[in-house]
């Protein structure tokens, strides 16, 4: 076997590993956001208000956010391939338990445990992918993994709605348990041993934003944006059902359009981060705020709402990659630790966004969650503009 052949084989194996990590992101994210597409049947089946059903997203995000810096630091000596395998095992079992849970409290407890696993993955996944490939391909590997977000939006959540409409929500989670198991097998087969790298103790993790002004600003930007975006997105199905009397088929198609736009936004973001990730964040935040406002002004027109969802998805896709790049630029020597803090901020904001938006939905109507989203994403935009010199 020639040296060139060995290098090709090694390169192919590396990118198979990146693909396995991307698939992992897909199953983690779809599991986290699955209730978004199933809120109506879930709340009806379990006899809880739709806002209470949104706690499935809230508690998942709370555990993913608050637990991750501790778990990442405590597992800093654990081989990352082994750690990812354990995380996927938790996801597989958790989806299985969710599918057979006899009551809502048990389901929430299960989601809480799954959230811990999800948060740790978000902290280590991108850095794992970047380590698998040559340094010159690290950015492309990161973009590939982040594309799993768009794939999840294009296929995962709409597919969950489709499966629920053909079977029921319990069967949908059972299928996702099987899918999680397949991804676990792929990770074991495709990813080589990856000893822990660039990890620090808990005390040093929490000291990072105290010492690092750039990282602290990026975390504030991310938290405000995610609060607004996911506060609105968590209740997009009830909003479309109320405003447009949308059928499950229309909602599935609309969310697929949103997800496809997210894939486009991720592609654009991959180009923007090499130019100016801060400006990319500004453009994306502006696009999300504008799309939410125009969504409210679109009235009952289904076509107009789909167009606004496409703008929303594209803008979100741009922001996603830009915020990861800004985090890396703020703390290049402690990226995994910084990403654990980013994950804490991100997922806690998902949880709080879903919680506050749920309160608005239950007390002032579903339309109010769109105003909530506009206010918070605009705040993220203003912070980014006001701190331009410190985030470049």
Which role does the model predict for each range below?
Residues 47, 79, 100-106, 245, ...:
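Helix-breaking motifs and short loop linkers at transmembrane-helix boundaries and internal kinks
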Residues 66-105:
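Conserved MFS/SLC helix-loop-helix module at the cytosolic interface between two early adjacent transmembrane helices
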Residues 67-80, 265-277, 361-362:
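Helix-to-loop junctions at the C-terminal end of transmembrane segments
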Residues 94-97, 105-114, 303-311:
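Paired small-residue
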Residues 104-106, 134-191, 239:
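Helix-loop-helix hairpin linking two adjacent transmembrane segments in secondary transporters
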Residues 110-149:
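Cytoplasmic helix-loop-helix junction between adjacent transmembrane helices
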Residues 121-133, 318-331:
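Intracellular juxtamembrane helix-capping segments at the cytosolic ends
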Residues 279-323:
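C-terminal transmembrane helical hairpin of 12-TM major facilitator-type secondary transporters
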């Amino acid at each position: 076997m020639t040296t060139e052949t060995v290098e090709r084989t090694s390169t192919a194996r590396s990118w198979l590993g990146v693909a396995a990590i991307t698939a992992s992101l897909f199953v983690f994210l779809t599991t986290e956001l699955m209730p978004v597409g199933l809120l109506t049947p879930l709340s009806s089946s379990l006899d809880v208000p739709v806002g209470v059903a949104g706690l499935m997203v809230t508690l998942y995000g709370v555990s993913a956010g608050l637990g991750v810096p501790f778990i990442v630091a405590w597992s800093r000596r654990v081989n990352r391939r082994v750690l990812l395998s354990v995380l996927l095992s938790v996801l597989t079992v958790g989806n299985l338990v969710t599918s057979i849970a006899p009551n809502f409290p048990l389901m929430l407890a299960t989601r809480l445990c799954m959230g811990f696993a999800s948060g740790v993955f978000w902290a280590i996944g991108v850095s794992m992918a970047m380590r698998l490939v040559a340094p010159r391909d690290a950015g492309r590997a990161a973009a590939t993994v982040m594309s799993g977000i768009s794939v999840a939006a294009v296929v995962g959540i709409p597919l969950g709605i489709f499966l629920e409409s053909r079977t029921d929500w319990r069967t949908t989670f059972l299928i996702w348990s099987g899918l999680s198991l397949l991804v676990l097998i792929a990770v074991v087969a495709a990813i080589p041993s990856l000893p822990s790298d660039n990890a620090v103790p808990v005390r040093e993790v929490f000291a990072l934003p105290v010492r690092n002004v750039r990282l602290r600003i990026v975390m504030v930007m991310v938290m405000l944006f995610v609060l607004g975006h996911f506060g609105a997105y968590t209740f997009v199905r009830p909003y479309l059902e109320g405003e447009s009397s949308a059928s499950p088929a229309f909602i599935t198609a609309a969310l697929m359009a949103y997800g496809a736009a997210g894939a486009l936004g991720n592609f654009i973001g991959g180009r923007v981060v090499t130019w100016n990730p801060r400006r990319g964040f500004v453009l994306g935040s502006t696009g999300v705020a504008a799309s939410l406002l125009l969504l409210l002004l679109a009235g009952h027109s289904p076509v107009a709402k789909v167009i606004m969802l496409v703008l929303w998805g594209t803008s979100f896709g741009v922001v996603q990659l830009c915020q990861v790049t800004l985090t890396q630029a703020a703390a290049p020597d402690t990226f995994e630790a910084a990403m654990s803090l980013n994950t804490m901020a991100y997922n806690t904001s998902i949880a709080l966004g879903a919680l506050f938006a749920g309160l608005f939905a239950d007390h002032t109507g579903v339309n109010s969650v769109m105003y909530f989203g506009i206010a918070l994403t605009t705040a993220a935009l203003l912070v980014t503009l006001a701190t331009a010199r410190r985030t470049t």
